[in-house]
């Protein structure tokens, strides 16, 4: 049984929607908070969490009337407690407090904590059997099989926040699941869409951080430039929608207007369109199964001069080849790919390896660990974190070799 609903018509729960935002001070969390503000009277905020931005967390908690606020860094506890003194808001710190926030009585949880730290809280939220708006990639990339099984077993509803997966989710409502042929994820192509292999190999940090369409953090902007973001999205779609690897295609769409397409047996292709603005999929998830007013710019089709598509080049962008190989290998290979990529991106941003070295380090780590039999799929958050740790250590050990080959 899939935890992602196949139809859009389930009734809205009666009364106000009780909301928890895990990762409230990040871009996704802030956008969610803004939508909650706009819908005053329809939402009540139960809990908010942050990594270490105590000032912003305290401000949001007071403004939104949260009942509980938690910070990941335990050393920030005293600061948060002081910032919320006299407010009546309960305060916590550390991993256990993040899990407590996820377990609080909310019927809609935004899981937007970044990185592996968001895995256990998201698992906890799914275990409550309510709606989880999933923005944390690690849940699906590192522990997709375990997470979706856990969500389904507890009758949780998982709504994809990522723009491409949200587009697929919306488009799937146009037909029956058994009539689905394939899905198509779109990619902007990033800053190096038309660059040569040599230009890509030697790209600078500054060049890689110039995304043509989206305003994002440094890590995801580099992932867009390498197309590892699309590789990770393939893994996410594989688990979210219970697809076979050959049912997931990618098209480069430079305008970033069409976010995802679904093809059915009668050869109808249904697509979701919108301005490149993450507030649209967030609003869709917050209002689901209904629609709420969103703040994104209205799409003016008359002003669009063209919508173009290109097949991606797996030679210039080996991430797309590596993710296919990881899915074929199965087990923990996707977890290894994600961890190695994080080490590689951090090393590139620190100017320790060239841009082309990112994919080479990921491939070398996959070869080292999958060959050693580290291929059992994680069955829990702890197992996923253990594989993640091993892969990071392996990637770090291989780093000097990758750097040496580039010199």
Swiss-Prot record:
Cofactor: Mg(2+); Mn(2+)
Reaction equations catalysed: 2-C-methyl-D-erythritol 4-phosphate + NADP(+) = 1-deoxy-D-xylulose 5-phosphate + NADPH + H(+)
Binding residues annotated for NADPH, in chain numbering: 25-28, 53, 136, 138, 217
Entry's Gene Ontology molecular function annotations: 1-deoxy-D-xylulose-5-phosphate reductoisomerase activity; manganese ion binding; NADPH binding
Domain of life: Bacteria
EC number: 1.1.1.267
Residues the record lists as binding Mn(2+): 162, 164, 233
Pathway annotation: Isoprenoid biosynthesis; isopentenyl diphosphate biosynthesis via DXP pathway; isopentenyl diphosphate from 1-deoxy-D-xylulose 5-phosphate: step 1/6
Gene3D superfamilies per the UniProt record, alphabetical: 1.10.1740.10, NAD(P)-binding Rossmann-like Domain
Coiled coil feature spans: none
Key words, A-Z: Isoprene biosynthesis, Manganese, Metal-binding, NADP, Oxidoreductase
Biological processes per GO annotation: isopentenyl diphosphate biosynthetic process, methylerythritol 4-phosphate pathway involved in terpenoid biosynthetic process
Annotated binding of 1-deoxy-D-xylulose 5-phosphate, by residue: 137, 163-164, 188, 211, 224, 229-230, 233
Family from the record: Belongs to the DXR family.
Function noted in UniProt: Catalyzes the NADPH-dependent rearrangement and reduction of 1-deoxy-D-xylulose-5-phosphate (DXP) to 2-C-methyl-D-erythritol 4-phosphate (MEP).
Protein name, per record: 1-deoxy-D-xylulose 5-phosphate reductoisomerase
Organism taxonomic ancestry: Bacteria, Pseudomonadati, Pseudomonadota, Alphaproteobacteria, Hyphomicrobiales
Gene coding for it: dxr
């Amino acid at each position: 049984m899939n935890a992602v609903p196949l139809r859009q018509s389930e009734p809205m729960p009666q009364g106000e929607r009780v909301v928890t935002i895990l990762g409230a001070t990040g871009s996704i969390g802030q956008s969610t908070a803004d939508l909650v503000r706009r819908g005053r009277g329809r939402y009540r905020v139960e809990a908010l969490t942050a990594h270490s931005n105590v000032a912003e967390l305290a401000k949001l908690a007071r403004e939104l009337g949260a009942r509980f606020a938690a910070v990941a860094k335990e050393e920030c506890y005293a600061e948060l407690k002081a910032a919320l003194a006299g407010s009546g808001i309960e305060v916590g710190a550390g991993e256990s407090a993040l899990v407590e926030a996820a377990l609080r009585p909310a019927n809609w949880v935004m899981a937007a904590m970044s990185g592996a730290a968001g895995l256990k809280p998201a698992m906890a939220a799914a275990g409550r059997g309510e709606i989880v708006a999933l923005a944390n990639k690690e849940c699906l990339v590192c522990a997709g099989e375990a997470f979706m099984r856990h969500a389904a077993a507890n009758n949780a509803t998982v709504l994809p926040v990522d723009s491409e997966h949200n587009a697929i989710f919306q488009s799937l409502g146009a037909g029956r699941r058994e009539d689905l042929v394939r899905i198509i994820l779109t990619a902007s192509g990033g800053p190096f869409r038309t660059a040569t292999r040599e230009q890509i190999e030697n790209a600078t940090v500054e060049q890689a951080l110039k995304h043509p369409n989206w305003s994002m953090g440094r890590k995801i902007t580099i992932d867009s430039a390498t197309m590892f973001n699309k590789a990770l999205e393939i893994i996410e779609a594989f688990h979210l929608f219970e697809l076979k690897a050959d049912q997931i295609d990618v098209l480069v769409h430079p305008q970033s207007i069409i976010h995802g397409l679904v093809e059915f047996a009668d050869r109808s292709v249904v697509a979701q369109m919108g301005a490149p603005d993450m507030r649209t999929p967030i609003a869709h998830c917050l209002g689901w199964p209904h629609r709420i007013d969103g703040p994104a710019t209205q799409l003016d089709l008359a002003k669009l001069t063209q919508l173009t598509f290109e097949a991606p080049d797996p030679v210039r962008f080996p991430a797309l080849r590596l993710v296919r190989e990881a899915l074929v290998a199965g087990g923990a290979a996707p977890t290894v790919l994600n961890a190695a990529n994080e080490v590689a991106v951090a090393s590139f941003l620190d100017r320790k390896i060239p841009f082309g070295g990112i994919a080479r380090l990921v491939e070398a780590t996959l070869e080292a660990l999958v060959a050693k039999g580290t291929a059992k799929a994680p069955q829990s958050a702890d197992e996923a974190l253990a594989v993640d740790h091993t892969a990071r250590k392996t990637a770090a050990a291989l780093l000097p070799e990758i750097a040496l080959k580039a010199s």
